[in-house]
Design a protein with these regions (language model features):
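An alpha-helical, amphipathic repeat domain used for nucleic-acid recognition
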Residues: 1-185
């Protein structure tokens, strides 16, 4: 293990930066923000480097190699079908990746238009191989799992009630969730 700091690579000219960006997009889809962040390490600091990045991004958009709306649609479909994530989780992930708020809203409204959130939450539990909880501790684990999965508390408690859990357990979980929400707000 070397203690010397890593040597910064030589800044790329515009044509090499374009090839670098195409290679990065060839490995996986990226948003404009992600690609700009990736290219920033390969150019000079300041306006000169930013001008190269902007030129490459514009060229990639014109060639339709880089398209945030196509990315958002594909990402949402994959998260919904494969991971069985709820709308909130996908919204947070798209936002973290730099997709615009309006685009996220329209994409999610279209993708989750004919999807039952309760059915999706049950599929998420099946995917995670979660069994019906037998005590309060396991019930709290299920609640946390579904909240992380992007499902609303209304749907979560509807599922818990359908499992005929004792009223004391549901009441305890509701107070725990209310306390957690008060702390995080």
């Amino acid at each position: 293990m070397s203690l010397r700091p890593k040597k910064k690579p030589e800044p790329l000219d515009e044509s090499l930066l374009y090839e670098y960006a195409v290679g990065a997009l060839g490995r996986r889809m990226r948003t404009v923000v992600e690609l700009k962040r990736l290219m920033r390490t390969r150019v000079e600091e300041g306006d000169v480097g930013q001008a190269k990045i902007d030129a490459v991004v514009q060229r990639l958009k014109e060639q339709r190699y880089l398209d945030d709306s196509a990315y958002a649609v594909t990402f949402t479909r994959l998260r919904q079908e494969n991971d069985k994530f709820g709308k909130r989780r996908v919204q947070q992930e798209l936002s973290r990746k730099g997709v615009g708020t309006d685009l996220i809203s329209t994409t999610l409204d279209t993708a989750y238009e004919n999807v039952s959130e309760e059915e999706l939450a049950r599929k998420h539990l099946d995917r995670k191989r979660v069994k019906q909880p037998v005590n309060e501790k396991e019930s709290a684990r299920v609640v946390r799992l579904l909240v992380r999965g992007g499902f609303s508390l209304g749907v979560i408690f509807k599922i818990l009630k359908s499992w005929n859990l004792p009223d004391e357990t549901l009441a305890a979980l509701e107070t725990i969730e209310l306390n957690d929400n008060a702390v995080s707000d």
